[in-house]
């Protein structure tokens, strides 16, 4: 059984036991979170597609940790002007483990 959930403007295909890194959620590690925005649920040959979400289906997950992603380096270079600007960014992430798909 798998489901496609929407969180943080992204879509993720999840199964029970899947570990994901998603955009930061303001929840402490060890707590549980429920995703109600489920786009697709599949149980073998039985597939439910939502319009836009599947009703009465939720996905439960446990927060493992909070952290930052890899650093993204931004370099703006102006040729022949002896001008350069460097910048970096690290996205705040939450690591979750899918506990249960309630279909």
UniProtKB/Swiss-Prot annotation:
Q: Which residues form a coiled coil?
A: none
A single Pfam family, by name?
A: Ribosomal_L21p
One GO BP annotation here?
translation
One molecular function GO term is:
rRNA binding
Mind telling me which InterPro entries this protein's record contains?
A: bL21-like, bL21-like_sf, Ribosomal_bL21, Ribosomal_bL21_CS
Annotated signal sequence is none
Q: Which UniProt keywords apply?
A: Ribonucleoprotein, Ribosomal protein, RNA-binding, rRNA-binding
All disulfide bonds of the chain are: none
In the record, the note on similarity to other proteins reads: Belongs to the bacterial ribosomal protein bL21 family.
Q: Which HAMAP family match?
A: Ribosomal_bL21
**Name the UniProt record assigns to this protein:** Large ribosomal subunit protein bL21
Give the species.
Vesicomyosocius okutanii subsp. Calyptogena okutanii (strain HA)
Taxonomic lineage is: Bacteria, Pseudomonadati, Pseudomonadota, Gammaproteobacteria, Candidatus Pseudothioglobaceae
């Amino acid at each position: 059984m798998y489901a496609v959930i929407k969180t943080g403007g992204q879509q993720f295909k999840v199964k029970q036991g899947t570990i994901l890194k998603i955009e930061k959620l303001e929840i402490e590690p060890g707590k549980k979170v429920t995703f109600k925005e489920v786009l697709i649920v599949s149980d073998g040959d039985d597939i439910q597609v939502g319009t836009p979400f599947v009703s009465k289906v939720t996905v439960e997950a446990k927060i493992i940790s909070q952290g930052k992603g890899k650093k993204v380096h931004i370099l703006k270079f102006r040729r022949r002007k002896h001008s350069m600007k460097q910048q970096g960014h690290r996205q705040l992430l939450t690591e979750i483990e899918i506990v249960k798909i309630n279909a």
